[in-house]
């Protein structure tokens, strides 16, 4: 029995040999993701060429850097970072230039940060490793109290939960890679940090101007994107639930609830949905995943997601082929369970015109599973069947 759930594997330019890609494909990989934040167009082209040498059936997705807040580089003497301690006051300031940070002032790449962030806001650095709170605002700087100590390292990510940030949706680097993707006939663009439909429309305009049919997958990575999911779904081809940054923006215990909500919305809208981040994270360093990770993959498949994604597991992990094979085995097992024990599907999730049509659809799905048919062919005049 072949699996229906697709597996996306992130490939790095540091490890993209034809034989390596072939081994992932034979293990069950269906699509390759290229993270443009870590490659050049030249090195990305090598990945694409090698993927196509393996099989034209492998879809290719490029992941844009997107609009994100980051720290700047460090001044001389602070190249390895700036140590901070709990209770210490730190001054932070936005800049349009790449001004180096020091122990006097920490700079961020968003010049509007002073006006956008109110007193009392929490600032998270490096995916939440460091937490600060804004206690005062003075001289165009945010005065922040350190909640947990550590080292502020250069160019780390910055999240400010609950605070809408007005950054350009498409960066200069994104423009470069989107146009490159058009030239290379890439299949999908996964656009990062989508907050509202205008972010999707900005990418659509670039594609339309060049008469490109590349599909857009919107990455939901913040609470604003979750709040605006309905308008985003109106414009996007599909959704990626990117649980890494999302888990920093919202409380960890809300992640399963939010994932279920987003999957349900996608099914209702008949839009593909991908679950990403730390699905088999243990396999970056270990040959076997935890039981919790297996259950995470299984639950995503039970929720009827279209694809599950591997990031560091295949990009730089020690057991990339084993990770893909493990995910494929889980997918087959869950799908086989549905064949033997009945589909875990609620047809009411899908917007169907009336109850008669809904009952016919339910019966057709269950009959096809019980009889193990390969396809359902529908003859329709109205298009609503």
Language-model segments: what does each one mean?
Residues 1-385:
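Non-catalytic helical/linker scaffolds that mediate oligomerization, partner binding
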């Amino acid at each position: 029995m072949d699996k229906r759930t697709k597996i996306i594997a992130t490939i790095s330019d540091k490890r993209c040999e034809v034989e390596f890609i072939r081994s992932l494909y034979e293990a069950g990989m269906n699509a390759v993701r290229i993270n443009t934040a870590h490659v050049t167009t030249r090195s990305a082209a090598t990945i694409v060429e090698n993927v196509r040498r393996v099989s034209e059936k492998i879809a290719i997705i490029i992941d844009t850097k997107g609009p994100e807040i980051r720290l700047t580089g460090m001044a001389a003497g602070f190249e390895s970072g700036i140590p901070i301690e709990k209770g210490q006051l730190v001054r932070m300031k936005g800049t349009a230039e790449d001004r180096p940070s020091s122990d006097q002032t920490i700079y961020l790449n968003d010049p509007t940060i002073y006006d956008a962030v109110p007193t009392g806001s929490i600032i998270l650095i490096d995916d939440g490793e460091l937490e600060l709170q804004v206690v005062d605002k003075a001289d165009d700087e945010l005065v922040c109290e350190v909640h947990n100590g550590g080292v502020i390292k250069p160019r780390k990510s910055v999240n400010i939960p609950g605070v809408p940030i007005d950054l350009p949706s498409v960066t200069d680097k994104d423009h470069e890679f989107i146009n490159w993707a058009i030239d290379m006939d890439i299949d999908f663009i996964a656009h990062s940090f989508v907050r509202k439909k205008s972010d999707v429309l900005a990418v659509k305009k670039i594609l339309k101007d060049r008469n490109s049919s590349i599909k857009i997958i919107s990455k939901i990575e913040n609470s604003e994107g979750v709040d605006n999911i309905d308008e985003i779904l109106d414009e996007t081809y599909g959704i990626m639930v990117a649980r890494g940054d999302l888990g920093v923006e919202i409380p960890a215990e809300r992640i399963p609830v939010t994932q279920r909500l987003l999957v349900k919305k996608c099914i209702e809208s008949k839009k593909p949905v991908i679950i990403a981040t730390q699905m088999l994270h243990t396999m970056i360093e270990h040959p076997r995943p935890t039981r919790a990770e297996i259950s995470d993959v299984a639950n995503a498949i039970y929720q009827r997601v279209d694809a599950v994604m591997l990031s560091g597991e295949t990009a730089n992990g020690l057991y990339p082929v084993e990770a893909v094979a493990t995910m494929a085995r889980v997918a087959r097992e869950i799908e086989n369970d549905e064949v033997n024990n009945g589909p875990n599907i609620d047809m009411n999730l899908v917007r169907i015109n009336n109850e008669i049509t809904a009952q016919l659809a339910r019966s057709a799905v269950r009959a096809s599973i019980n009889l193990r048919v390969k396809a359902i062919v529908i003859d329709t005049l109205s298009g609503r069947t």
